[in-house]
Amino acid sequence: AHTYRYEAGGVAVFGGIQPQPLPQQADGTLKLDDIAAAIKPDDEHFARTRLLALENTWNGKVLALDYLDAATGLAHARGLATHLD
């Protein structure tokens, strides 16, 4: 997502956020299993996972509403906020 690659590290500099990019599928989605696996445990040795950021459109392609519902549903079930860029 451009929020990771092209924003001059703004999320880290201004927000104190440690982004963790995940591999994207050819259609711009993230595998739900990859999202779930990337959520850090409640352990002082890890940066706390608090947010799922998705990008829509992705290279001009609109992500399917059912995918967005599933991804944000997973995030909310795990206590994460969501951001759609």
Question: Which ranges hold each PLM region?
Answer:
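Catalytic PLP-binding core of fold-type I/II PLP enzymes
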Residues: 63-85
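Active-site-proximal loop->helix
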Residues: 6-18
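Conserved PLP-anchoring active-site segment centered on the Schiff-base-forming lysine
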Residues: 1-5
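PLP-dependent aminotransferase-class I/II
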Residues: 15-57, 62-70
